[in-house]
């Protein structure tokens, strides 16, 4: 059994540090036992501050404990199956409370975690049992919707003197002789991480009855470095071993790369040094891309060598000057261009829907759209077709679009068949007139045929010649 498990505190009295937080936890437990449901506890703090240990001690105050690691069960279905039903049900005959522990709720990352945060919020809302959640990063975006539903307790790093006292008790229990200055140095190196200090002590004491300064130097290491310390070591030193030690940081390695890239021109003076440094950084970025694409994170090792020792050796000599290092400007640029990027994505989505293309292809067409929008009439037609807002139109042209004054033109169908249509119309009119005449003659009674003794002129005689010889005397009689 490791010493961290062997000497894990079993009660609140044995916990090192964060006494104010422990007092609030005791009040929370007391309220639950009095039948007053409370918000879930969200224990937030860096590694080694005792979050999981406190959760286990709280579990001893209730009848049962259900512990889940949220980063292992990331999807909504997995979380609901594991904790959803258990949190929403209570026995009809047993009123004992069950503690539900969700560890590392800020460890949900990636596309596979769809619905994970929503599931946690749903479990919190429906839970009829006390809940304790733990997280390392208080500023994680995953906690934005969870924090309002919880009682947040921030755990601070354990003080160096408290860590040294805990290490001293372990040495006495194990029968190991260790000077106080060595224990203080171990505590200092742990940077407030009690678990890390105990692990270091166990590693140094293996097979030994006494720990002296010589063992301390042999086991010397800096568990984690500050981000700016790592950047300073890379840019100020040419010592490869020193740079490698400084590169052991807890931050995202791509963030370290951005910080180094931002400060290279501030430290290096010669153009060839800057060129070599950025060549190393670009190669490191390629390996980061491969790691993400193939999910083979051993590529990070090569990226770390390139952006650490590679950049450090890119300079011909170290510069003994004061340089004020700054953070990555990419975050400031992204903040300033957030609105513009939002408009770009909105227009790309509209183009993709209307033109049946991908948003990526739509964005690649923006330069051509700027050319098309130089024509007022075309700009008006395109903006009407895509249903663009005024602020979206400004992506392609600065001045407003005026509605063009167009002449009224005949409809397309009339242009094509206009003469034919008019001819058909005239023929139809003549036909209707003839039909009316036929109907009128059909209704008029037929007079008896008698010779007319009145004189007739030439016109009448000519018209009589055209008449049939035998007159029709009945509607049903035909010649």
Swiss-Prot record:
Annotated positions binding ATP: 45-52
Region: Disordered, residue numbers: 402-479
Entries under InterPro entries matching the protein: AAA+_ATPase (IPR003593), ATPase_AAA_core (IPR003959), P-loop_NTPase (IPR027417), Rep_factor-C_lsu (IPR023935), RFC_lid (IPR047854)
Statement: the UniProt record of this protein carries the keyword Translocase: no
Domain of life of the native organism: Archaea
Composition-biased stretches (Basic and acidic residues): 423-442, 449-472
Keywords, alphabetical: ATP-binding, DNA replication, Nucleotide-binding
GO molecular function, one term: ATP binding
GO BP field: DNA replication
Presence of the UniProt keyword ATP-binding in the record: yes
Annotated function: Part of the RFC clamp loader complex which loads the PCNA sliding clamp onto DNA. The complex possesses DNA-dependent ATPase activity which is further stimulated by PCNA. In conjunction with PCNA stimulates DNA synthesis by PolB, relieving inhibition by replication protein A (RPA).
Membership in a protein family: Belongs to the activator 1 small subunits family. RfcL subfamily.
Subunit structure: Heterohexamer composed of four small subunits (RfcS) and two large subunits (RfcL).
Name used for this protein in its record: Replication factor C large subunit
Species: Methanothermobacter thermautotrophicus (strain ATCC 29096 / DSM 1053 / JCM 10044 / NBRC 100330 / Delta H) (Methanobacterium thermoautotrophicum)
Gene that produces this protein: rfcL
């Amino acid at each position: 059994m490791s010493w961290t498990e062997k000497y894990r505190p079993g009660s609140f009295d044995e916990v090192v540090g964060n006494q104010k937080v422990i007092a609030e936890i005791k009040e929370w437990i007391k309220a639950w036992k009095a039948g007053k449901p409370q918000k879930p506890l969200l224990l937030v703090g860096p590694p080694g501050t005792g979050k999981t240990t406190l959760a286990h001690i709280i579990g001893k105050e209730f009848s049962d404990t259900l512990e889940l690691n949220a980063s292992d069960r990331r999807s909504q279905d997995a979380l609901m199956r594991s904790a959803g039903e258990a949190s929403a049900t209570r026995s009809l005959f047993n009123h004992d409370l069950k503690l539900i522990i969700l560890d590392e709720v800020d460890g949900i990352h990636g596309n596979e975690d769809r619905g994970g945060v929503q599931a946690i919020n749903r479990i919190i809302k429906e839970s009829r049992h006390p809940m304790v959640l733990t997280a390392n990063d208080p500023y994680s975006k995953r906690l934005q919707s969870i924090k309002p539903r919880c009682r947040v307790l921030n755990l601070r790093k354990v003080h160096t003197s408290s860590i040294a006292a805990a290490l001293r008790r372990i040495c006495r229990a194990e029968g190991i002789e260790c000077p106080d200055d060595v224990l203080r140095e171990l505590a200092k190196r742990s940077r407030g991480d009690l678990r890390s200090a105990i692990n270091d002590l166990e590693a140094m004491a293996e097979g030994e009855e006494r720990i002296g300064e010589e063992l301390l130097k042999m086991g010397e290491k800096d568990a984690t470095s500050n981000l700016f310390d790592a950047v300073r070591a890379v840019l100020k030193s040419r010592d490869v071993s020193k740079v490698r030690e400084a590169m052991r940081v807890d931050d995202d390695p791509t963030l370290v790369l951005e910080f180094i890239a931002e400060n290279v021109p501030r430290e290096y003076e010669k153009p060839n040094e800057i060129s070599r440094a950025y060549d190393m950084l670009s190669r490191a970025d390629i390996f980061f891309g491969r790691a993400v694409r193939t999910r083979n994170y051993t590529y990070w090792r090569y990226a770390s060598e390139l952006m650490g020792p590679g950049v450090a050796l890119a300079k011909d000599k170290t510069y003994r000057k004061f340089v004020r290092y700054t953070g990555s400007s990419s975050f400031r640029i992204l903040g300033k261009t957030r609105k513009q990027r939002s408009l770009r994505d909105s227009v790309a989505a509209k183009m993709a829907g209307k033109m049946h293309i991908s948003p990526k292809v739509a964005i690649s067409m923006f330069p051509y759209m700027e050319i098309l929008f130089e024509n007022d009439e075309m700009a008006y037609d395109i903006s009407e077709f895509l249903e663009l807002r005024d602020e979206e139109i400004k992506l392609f042209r600065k001045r407003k679009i005026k509605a063009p004054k167009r002449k009224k033109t005949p409809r397309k169908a009339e242009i094509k068949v206009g003469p034919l249509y008019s001819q058909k119309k005239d023929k139809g009119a003549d036909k209707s007139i003839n039909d009316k005449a036929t109907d009128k003659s059909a209704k008029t009674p037929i007079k008896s045929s008698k010779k007319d003794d009145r004189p007739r002129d030439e016109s009448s005689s000519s018209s009589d010649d055209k008449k049939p010889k035998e007159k029709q005397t009945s509607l049903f009689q035909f010649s």
